[in-house]
A protein has these predicted regions:
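Aromatic- and acidic-residue-enriched segments that line the glycan-binding/catalytic groove
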Residues: 97-110, 151-194, 233-272, 324-335
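Substrate-binding cleft/loops of secretory-pathway carbohydrate-active enzymes
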Residues: 152-155, 239, 305-372, 376-377, ...
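Active-site neighborhood of glycoside hydrolase catalytic domains
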Residues: 216, 220-224, 228-232, 237-238, ...
Length: 463
């Protein structure tokens, strides 16, 4: 869930880059009205799960070579009242922290440290994921493994360099996304200016070779039999509607609509713009179907190897604009084409590509500003959760959670009073519990007591 960095100062950038979140381009914020803290949901007898995310990059310096540090922090996680951990084992470079027959092991990642912006290296040979599974289970924690899905490399800012499969294997360039730039279609691997093009290099979700590769990787991951497997960045890339306009995508789209596109790509969107053409809504449906169909394949791949492992995704809760990522995470019973302004981008069959009914659980990023906890609209933590639940329509248990290190007002710490409120807003609005992103922020800003207070306040309502 790693964001683009908001470079305001060296200090803010250090905090931000050390532990980021998936937040592709977002719209103007709609704050809505504040509500009373307690919410209106009635207490439930059964405890809901409490997850804490463990981002690979944000925690790499502390965990990559130290089992003792992992043990120490997991004890704190348990004592604080969390029930589950979500361990990121495939960051945006695409390399992995588990044994795989198809992916390279993660050996280094870019971080901000006391020494500045540097590469952090892993020299240890012990199994990273297995260690979390062993140590977490000893404490009674459930251990979920998370991967960044359609990613294959990372170009660092400041000239630090790059890493990942797309950079090591030139033959994989055809797997990278192609954007609908002004005047021509451009493979993102041809965009290598570290001042303007830095960030994640995505893979094309419509490329069948890419999908087969990722399914093999998921099969390897499922052999660990974690309590859950979660797909992050299972979407199109940060260029939004400009992606993907490769020959492979054109071929698949024409099969989808049953005819040739006479003027590609302008009949979909005018190059370099988001001005819609005649096929615009069908293109949005095609992209959503591409992700929907991959979710089904991924679910089946995991279950074939480890039937008891729960399968889910992380998505941004901003449904009103998440279509630009090619994802419909809602229930297929929810029809956006009949829901006000959504009809401008959603065709009548867009609902058919909602994938919530193919999941065991889902995580909604409720990434609002620090002073926008309670409310009923998007861009409030509580509103994100309530609106998300309405679109999921009971198809899947869902957990919402804030980003307590990167969102507006959270960046510099000192927000311990807002952490319990965030926990309250999420856990009472979500039937599947809550999560916090990320453990590195809890540790960095010493939010342990604040987390425990929020969880204890909730537990008092169910006992």
């Amino acid at each position: 869930m790693k964001k683009k960095l908001w470079i305001a100062s060296f200090f803010c950038l250090c905090l931000f880059a050390s532990c980021g979140g998936d937040d592709n381009k977002v719209p103007d914020w709609n704050w809505g009205e504040e509500e009373e803290e307690g919410g209106t949901d009635k207490p439930e007898a059964k405890e809901k799960p409490r997850y804490v995310w463990i981002d690979a990059a944000g925690n790499f310096e502390r965990y990559a070579n130290s089992i003792d540090n992992i043990k120490e922090d997991l004890r704190k996680v348990k004592e604080t009242g969390f029930t589950d951990i979500v361990v990121d084992v495939r960051p945006t470079t695409g390399d992995v922290l588990f044994k795989s027959s198809v992916a390279e092991p993660l050996k280094r990642i870019d971080i901000w440290s006391n020494a500045g912006y540097v590469w952090a290296e892993r020299t240890a040979t012990w199994d990273y994921l297995q260690t979390f599974l062993d140590e977490g289970h000893k404490l009674g924690l459930k251990v979920n493994a998370c991967i960044n899905t359609f990613v294959g490399g990372y170009l660092c800012p400041y000239g630090l360099g790059y890493e990942g499969m797309l950079y090591r294997d030139a033959s994989k360039k055809k797997w990278a996304t192609v954007i609908n730039a002004t005047g021509r279609q451009v493979n993102t691997m041809d965009l290598q200016n570290y001042e303007t093009d830095w960030g994640v290099k995505f893979l094309n979700p419509a490329n069948n070779e890419v999908q087969e590769y990722l399914l093999s990787l998921l099969s390897d991951l499922a052999k660990y039999k974690p309590d859950g497997i979660i797909l992050d960045r299972c979407r199109y890339d940060d260029y939004g509607l400009m992606s993907d306009f490769s020959p492979e995508s054109r071929t698949e789209f024409e099969l989808f609509i049953g005819e040739s596109v006479e003027n590609f790509p302008a009949d979909i969107m005018k190059p370099g713009t988001d001005i819609p053409g005649k096929w615009y809504k069908r293109w949005n449906a095609f992209r959503a179907k591409t992700i929907h169909d991959f979710i089904i394949k991924a679910h089946d791949e995991v279950k074939a190897v480890s039937p008891d492992t729960r399968f889910g995704t992380y998505v941004g809760a901003w449904y009103s604009t998440y279509y630009t990522s090619g994802v419909n995470w809602a229930s297929p019973k929810y029809n956006p084409a009949a829901d006000g302004s959504y009809s401008r981008w959603a065709d009548s069959d867009y609902k058919d590509y909602g994938y919530a009914d193919h999941l065991d659980f889902i995580f909604l990023g409720a990434y609002a500003a620090v002073d926008k906890i309670y409310g009923s609209t998007e861009w409030t933590v509580q509103g994100f959760c309530k609106l998300g639940g309405a679109k999921l329509m009971g198809d899947v248990p869902f957990a919402g959670g804030p980003d307590i290190g990167n969102g507006s007002g959270w960046e510099n710490g000192g927000q311990a009073n807002q952490v319990p409120k965030s926990i309250n807003a999420c856990i009472n609005a979500c039937d599947g519990g809550m999560f916090l992103f990320d453990l590195c922020h809890i540790r960095m800003h010493n939010y342990w007591d604040a987390c425990k207070q929020g969880i204890d306040n909730y537990l008092k309502t169910v006992k």
